[in-house]
């Protein structure tokens, strides 16, 4: 069954952009729903019962398949091609839901692991200013801007726990109820600084390939009788969409590679009292990388508007080419806002940050004071088909034809699927 009713819940913002949903049909509520299914606790808003056919199941095990970037538009375009996705549509329920804002993996994996929206945990983007460090870093990589290896910030003495403003994890809460959490993570990040914080309380099983991960998951599921959440994440569809752009032959081939392997390996699973959940954090938007508008080059008079942190580092723009967060020197805020609103009219929505917060774009209040310090002063939201960013040689620029983070339907409307047998 395809449950399209939530599509009517999305309200317009401006220029074809949509407002995110947090109260019900939202990625923000997946973690609460998992906890509810396994413990009966209600910590906050849940995904509505119609996402499960009208009644919440009471499984002993919940298996989640987090397929990065495989949002609603891609599920619609490719869902009929593969055994598993067809089964979820025909025998389970597939529901369009809202991504978070920003529609990013950094925000989403933090929300899934902690059970709170970005307004509470404060880790909203890949490029993000952390006042405790005095500079903008790449959050999940835990590295400074520029070309650095993963966890380079550890060598600078930074505490990765300070990236998040909430520290109790879903895994720790489940453990108090006697529910095991097992996360299947790629070796490239399984032991990373970020993952060590976000996955606290979970058992982490490492893999190098998709087939290895799916065999590990199937064997764990069939051999372990205890109550458990088994969580799987896969990034490659998102990676290829970034490099070549969504909707390209490369993207379609990666989608086929993932689901064909899934169909071949993860089938005839012997695990009663289990529910399988499929979801994505967002979709993607295409634009030609060469058409990226660089703010500091389009408007040279704005090149000196960035403030310095207390440690003397420039506070470079946060976010990405679909959601730009500008920290601006106080005396320049009015003229920078006016320049962007006038010079990019018809291309972007430009908002003072307090207005974005007042509209609840980051989730329900109260808003973490730490988030407010990180966000800066001006938010730039490009319309569909546009990338806007900042270029600083050796520090930042745009190399991709696919991005997400903003509020266009193709990136904001994502998907949640549920089925009780595979």
Stretches with model-predicted labels:
Residues 1-422:
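Feature captures the catalytic ectodomains and active-site-proximal regions of enzymes
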């Amino acid at each position: 069954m395809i449950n399209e009713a939530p599509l009517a819940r999305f309200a317009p913002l401006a220029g074809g952009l949509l407002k995110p949903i947090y109260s019900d049909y939202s990625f923000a509520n997946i973690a609460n729903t998992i906890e509810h299914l396994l413990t009966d606790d209600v910590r906050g808003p849940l995904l509505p019962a119609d996402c499960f056919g009208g009644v919440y199941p009471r499984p002993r095990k919940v298996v989640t398949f987090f397929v990065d970037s495989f949002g609603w538009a891609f599920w619609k375009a490719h869902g009929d091609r593969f055994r598993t996705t067809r089964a979820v549509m025909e025998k389970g329920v597939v529901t369009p839901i809202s991504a978070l804002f920003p529609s990013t993996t950094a925000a989403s994996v933090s929300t899934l692991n902690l059970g709170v929206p970005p307004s509470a945990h404060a880790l909203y983007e890949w490029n993000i200013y952390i006042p405790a460090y005095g500079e903008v870093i790449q959050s999940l990589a835990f590295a400074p801007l520029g070309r650095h290896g993963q966890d380079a910030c550890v060598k600078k003495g930074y505490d990765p726990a300070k990236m998040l403003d909430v520290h109790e994890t879903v895994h720790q809460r489940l453990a108090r109820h006697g529910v095991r959490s097992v996360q299947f993570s790629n070796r490239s990040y399984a032991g990373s600084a970020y993952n060590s914080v976000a996955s606290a309380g979970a058992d982490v099983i490492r893999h190098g390939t998709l087939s290895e991960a799916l065999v590990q998951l199937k064997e764990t599921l069939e051999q372990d009788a205890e109550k458990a959440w088994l969580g799987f994440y896969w990034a490659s569809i998102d990676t290829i969409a970034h490099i070549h752009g969504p909707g390209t032959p490369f993207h379609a081939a990666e989608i086929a590679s993932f689901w064909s392997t899934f169909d071949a390996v993860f089938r005839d699973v012997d695990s009663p009292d289990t529910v399988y959940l499929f979801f994505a954090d967002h979709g993607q938007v295409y634009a030609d990388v060469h058409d990226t508008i660089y703010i500091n080059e389009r408007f040279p008079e704005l090149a000196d508007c960035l403030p310095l942190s207390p440690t003397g580092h420039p506070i470079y723009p946060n976010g990405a080419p679909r959601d730009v967060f500008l920290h601006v020197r106080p005396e320049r805020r009015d003229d920078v806002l006016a320049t962007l609103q006038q010079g990019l009219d018809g291309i972007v929505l430009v908002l003072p940050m307090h207005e974005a917060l007042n509209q609840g774009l980051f989730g329900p209040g109260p808003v973490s004071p730490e988030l407010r310090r990180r966000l800066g002063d001006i938010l730039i939201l490009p319309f569909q088909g546009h990338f806007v960013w900042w270029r600083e040689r050796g520090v930042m620029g745009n190399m991709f034809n696919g991005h997400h983070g903003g509020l266009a339907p193709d990136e904001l409307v994502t998907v949640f699927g549920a089925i009780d047998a595979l």
